[in-house]
């Protein structure tokens, strides 16, 4: 749908509307921050202007939560990926991911290992799907990924 605050050219308003209908039937969605903003009609630039604030991740969680809370949806878990953020306790910027599952919000971080790589979201989705088949909750799925398990 988009990345780094930019919507892909192929992502038309009609496709956006259809994507919103489609995700309402999913049990788990894994949008990056741009995609979350597109799905919720949120302003990416307006949100990311708070990236240096201690409550930045809370702001993102508040944007994501309503996707789970409507009667028209069956979404159980939202995993917002690829959030660049330097938490007050960090000495450097890291990639953060928010897992909204049941009534809990988990924050998972990983150092930046050389940059951004195409296909990592697809890999994450595969791990999430396999974990669901195994009956694991999503935080357990993250712990099975070596790049994250040492950071949890």
Regions found by a protein language model. Name each.
Residues 17-20, 24, 126, 130, ...:
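Residues on a specific face of well-ordered alpha-helices
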Residues 85, 133, 149:
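Short Gly/Pro-enriched loop/turn and capping motifs at secondary-structure junctions
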Residues 1-5:
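N-terminal glycine-rich phosphate/adenylate-binding segment common to multiple enzyme folds
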Residues 8-105:
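Conserved phosphate/ATP/ADP-binding segment of small-molecule kinases
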Residues 87-89, 117, 151-152:
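Short active-site-adjacent structural elements
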Residues 139-152:
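Charged C-terminal helix
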Residues 114-138, 142:
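Short, small-residue alpha-helix embedded
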């Amino acid at each position: 749908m988009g990345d780094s605050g930019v919507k892909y050219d192929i992502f038309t308003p009609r496709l956006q509307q259809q994507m919103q209908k489609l995700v309402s039937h999913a049990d788990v969605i894994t949008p990056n921050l741009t995609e979350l903003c597109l799905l919720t009609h949120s302003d990416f630039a307006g949100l990311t202007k708070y990236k240096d604030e201690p409550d930045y991740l809370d702001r993102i969680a508040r944007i994501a939560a309503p996707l789970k809370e409507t009667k028209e949806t069956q979404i159980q878990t939202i995993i917002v990926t690829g959030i660049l953020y330097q938490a007050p306790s960090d000495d450097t910027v890291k990639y953060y991911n928010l897992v909204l599952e049941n009534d809990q919000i988990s924050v998972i971080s990983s150092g930046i290992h050389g940059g951004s790589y195409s296909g990592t979201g697809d890999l994450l989705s595969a791990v999430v799907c396999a974990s669901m088949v195994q009956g694991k909750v999503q935080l357990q799925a993250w712990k099975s990924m070596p790049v994250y398990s040492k950071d949890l």
